[in-house]
């Protein structure tokens, strides 16, 4: 191989590497279209396992036609556990995805449950002490505002609450009791009004919306 060929090969390899890196940067946003409106999630690089899993699910269309099956006012909206039209998800592909868990990436206090946070659902500690995440279901935090004194109940000597986290819960709101228990892997960067509408919907005794809220599509986008 002569010098020109070697240089061309190295240059091409560099371009491909830069292109791959740029594509990965573009892949940090996901736009969801629902029958209540749209919203965009930014995925965190700090939780690479969850980011890769979420992008994979989005690209294969796993969320299309699924519902927000659990909604609690002033708390959160959970998606990915139901199918549009009231179909039973048991035995379906999305059911198998939920059972394929992801290793926990809990990074409190860097990533915490402030308003608009996106986190992975999971089963309880009694059968899941490793706090592994559901492979499909996620929830979006609505939460509520807290006074500084109220936040003391969520602190301990082993897990103090940094001032910037306290400030976020006092000025933006959130669900501090979930910190350290679930993996936060993203944040709503556009369309929080849609989440507000979803969380304000009327639900039954099982927290299921009385009027179906479903995801029309989820697509990876390069910007919010």
PLM regions and their residue ranges:
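Bacterial N-terminal signal peptides
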Residues: 8-17
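Bacterial N-terminal signal peptides that target proteins for export
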Residues: 1-8
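Cyclophilin-like peptidyl-prolyl cis-trans isomerases
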Residues: 18-224
């Amino acid at each position: 191989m002569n010098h020109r060929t070697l240089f061309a090969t190295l240059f091409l390899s560099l371009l491909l590497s830069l292109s791959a890196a740029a594509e990965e940067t573009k892949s940090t946003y996901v736009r969801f279209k629902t029958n209540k409106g749209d919203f965009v999630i930014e995925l965190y690089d700090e939780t690479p396992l969850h980011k890769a899993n979420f992008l994979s699910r989005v690209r294969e269309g796993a969320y299309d036609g699924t519902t927000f099956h659990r909604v609690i006012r002033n708390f959160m909206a959970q998606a990915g556990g139901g199918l549009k039209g009231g179909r039973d998800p048991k035995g379906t592909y999305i059911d198998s995805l939920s059972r394929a868990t992801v290793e926990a990436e809990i990074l409190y206090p860097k990533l915490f449950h402030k308003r608009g946070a996106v986190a992975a659902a999971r089963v309880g500690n009694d059968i899941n002490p490793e706090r592994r995440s559901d492979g499909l279901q996620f929830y979006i935090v609505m939460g509520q505002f807290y006074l500084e004194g109220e936040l003391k109940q969520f602190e301990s000597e082993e897990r103090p609450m940094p001032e910037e986290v306290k400030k976020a819960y006092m000025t933006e709101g959130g669900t501090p009791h979930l910190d350290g228990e679930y993996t936060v892997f993203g944040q709503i960067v556009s369309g929080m009004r849609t989440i507000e509408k979803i969380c304000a919907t009327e639900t039954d005794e099982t927290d299921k919306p009385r009027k179906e809220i479903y995801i029309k599509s989820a697509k990876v986008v390069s910007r919010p």
